[in-house]
From Swiss-Prot:
UniProt keyword Phosphoprotein, yes or no: no
Pfam families cross-referenced by the UniProt entry: Ribosomal_S20p
GO terms (BP aspect): translation
Protein name per the record: Small ribosomal subunit protein bS20
Protein task: Binds directly to 16S ribosomal RNA.
Length: 98
């Protein structure tokens, strides 16, 4: 443990930031998983309510990824890669003819 007051504060700040970053990363992973399950549900039974659920979950995932990038939790390229993979899965499962 640090002895200097400023070093103690930095340790506390680093722990606070670690927990905040962990929460953001966990939320992004959860929303991405929800998107994939919504894609599969729509592919199995395409209907209007399933399509609406897909659009809502995709929008929520994009939003959370963008916020994580904006706050420095994810690197910009990592956020772009996650969004591109979601878009690719969306076009393969939900909208194959487009």
């Amino acid at each position: 443990m640090a002895n200097i007051k400023s070093a103690i504060k930095r340790v506390q700040i680093a722990e606070r930031n670690r927990l905040r970053n962990k929460a953001y990363k966990s939320a992004v992973k959860t929303l991405v998983k929800h998107c994939f399950t919504a894609f599969d549900a729509y592919a199995a039974d395409p209907n209007e309510t399933a399509r609406q659920a897909v659009n809502e979950r995709l929008s929520a995932a994009y939003s959370k990824i963008d916020k994580a990038v904006k706050r420095g939790v994810l690197h910009a390229n990592t956020g772009a890669r996650k969004k591109a993979r979601l878009a690719k899965a969306f076009h393969l499962k939900v909208d194959p003819q487009a």
